[in-house]
Amino acid sequence: SSSEDKVTVNFINRDGETLTTKGKVGDSLLDVVVENNLDIDGFGACEGTLACSTCHLIFEQHIYEKLEAITDEENDMLDLAYGLTDRSRLGCQICLTKAMDNMTVRVPDAVSDARESIDMGMNSSKIE
């Protein structure tokens, strides 16, 4: 495929390290993480079936405003995510567009899997 069908995405991982990768327009951010084997711990546990909240990402404001409207299903799942912000979405629901080229998304410090009641985040009670 030609390079113009790809966009660059920067993921700021939990440890603050930036992972820069490319994804195909139309792929979800979960696809991008999986296909590029990005080392984001626990990301995408349910493989995009909207059964967990591990692909929770925090977007830049100007990107967030252009995202597709959120569905009730995604909203319900986001409610279960730790460190929820007003710019949070689930990566499995967000598909790449050319407008997202070179965007930066942040992986929240704590991850919760809605399928488990186990507290995986060390500081989940702290609100940023």
Swiss-Prot record:
Q: Which PROSITE patterns match?
A: 2FE2S_FER_2, ADX
Q: Which residues carry this modification: Phosphoserine?
A: 3, 117
Q: Which Pfam families match?
A: Fer2
- Classification via SUPFAM superfamilies: 2Fe-2S ferredoxin-like (SSF54292)
Q: Which residues form the 2Fe-2S ferredoxin-type domain?
A: 7-111
Q: Which GO terms describe its molecular function?
A: 2 iron, 2 sulfur cluster binding; electron transfer activity; metal ion binding
Binding residues for [2Fe-2S] cluster: 46, 52, 55, 92
Q: Which residues carry this modification: N6-succinyllysine?
A: 6, 98
Q: InterPro entries recorded for this chain?
A: 2Fe-2S_ferredoxin-like_sf, 2Fe-2S_ferredoxin-type, Adrenodoxin-like, Adrenodoxin_Fe-S_BS, Beta-grasp_dom_sf
> Gene Ontology cellular component?
mitochondrial matrix
Keyword Electron transport in the entry? The reply is yes
Cofactor(s) demanded: [2Fe-2S] cluster
Which residues are modified to N6-acetyllysine?
6
Database matches in Gene3D superfamilies:
3.10.20.30
Give the cofactor note text.
Binds 1 [2Fe-2S] cluster.
The question of whether Electron transport is a record keyword is answered with yes
Its assembly, as annotated, is: Interacts with CYP11A1.
The similarity annotation says: Belongs to the adrenodoxin/putidaredoxin family.
Q: What does this protein do?
A: Essential for the synthesis of various steroid hormones. Participates in the reduction of mitochondrial cytochrome P450 for steroidogenesis. Transfers electrons from adrenodoxin reductase to CYP11A1, a cytochrome P450 that catalyzes cholesterol side-chain cleavage. Does not form a ternary complex with adrenodoxin reductase and CYP11A1 but shuttles between the two enzymes to transfer electrons.
The name this protein carries in UniProt is Adrenodoxin
Question: Which gene carries the instructions for this protein?
Answer: FDX1
